[in-house]
Amino acid sequence: MINIKPLSVNKAWQGRRFKTKEYKVYETELSALLPPLNVPNGKIRIDVTFHFKNSLSDIDNPLKPFLDILQKKYGFNDRDVYELNVKKQVGEDGIEFNIYQL
């Protein structure tokens, strides 16, 4: 598990064009925490579990920023994602994920 609080999409962009300072810090921290990984070529499936301290957190808000950072770190294109499984768990903040070839 990556021990970082998932960032809400609401805190990622100012207006429609500019990444917030909070997003840039999150991107730097998350990128440093992501493990080395070889992403398979072609169609892929991504499984993600977001762990939140608060049960009221929305499951979909951290998804876009997280996927964008994964793409940047691992060099794949989101058009190659054919399956996406997202789960929410309540506990300590964190993110678990796996990427599989289909």
Give the ranges of each region predicted by the language model.
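Acidic, proline/glycine-enriched N-terminal capping motif
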Residues: 1-102
